[in-house]
Swiss-Prot record:
<dbReference type="Pfam" id="PF03672">
    <property type="entry name" value="UPF0154"/>
</dbReference>
<protein>
    <recommendedName>
        <fullName>UPF0154 protein lwe1321</fullName>
    </recommendedName>
</protein>
<dbReference type="InterPro" id="IPR005359">
    <property type="entry name" value="UPF0154"/>
</dbReference>
<comment type="similarity">
    <text>Belongs to the UPF0154 family.</text>
</comment>
<keyword id="KW-0812">Transmembrane</keyword>
<keyword id="KW-1133">Transmembrane helix</keyword>
<feature type="compositionally biased region" description="Polar residues">
    <location>
        <begin position="57"/>
        <end position="66"/>
    </location>
</feature>
<keyword id="KW-1003">Cell membrane</keyword>
<dbReference type="GO" id="GO:0005886">
    <property type="term" value="C:plasma membrane"/>
</dbReference>
<feature type="transmembrane region" description="Helical">
    <location>
        <begin position="2"/>
        <end position="22"/>
    </location>
</feature>
<keyword id="KW-0472">Membrane</keyword>
<feature type="region of interest" description="Disordered">
    <location>
        <begin position="57"/>
        <end position="79"/>
    </location>
</feature>
Length: 79
């Protein structure tokens, strides 16, 4: 009787751990393919702040954000 409870708890924990890692991998690939901010969103944000965004300024900000994301990736891998 107690073996069934023990096996059930072990299976539950294994399912939770497996589900967590599968969901984490899915979300990381989703965010890599669909970044949370794009040029149109950046242009809209700048317009809301009262700035008239030029394409050069938008490209500079996008490249700065991409560099920041690339810079953070190695830090996360080391942990």
């Amino acid at each position: 009787m107690w073996i069934y409870i023990l096996v059930g708890i072990i299976c539950l924990l294994a399912g939770l751990a497996g589900g967590f890692f599968i969901a984490r991998r899915y979300m990381m690939s989703y965010l890599k393919n669909n970044p949370p901010i794009n040029e149109q969103m950046l242009q809209m944000m700048m317009a809301q702040m009262g700035q008239k965004p030029s394409q050069k300024k938008i490209n500079q900000m996008m490249s700065a954000m991409n560099k920041q994301q690339e810079k953070e990736k190695p830090k996360k891998a080391k942990k």
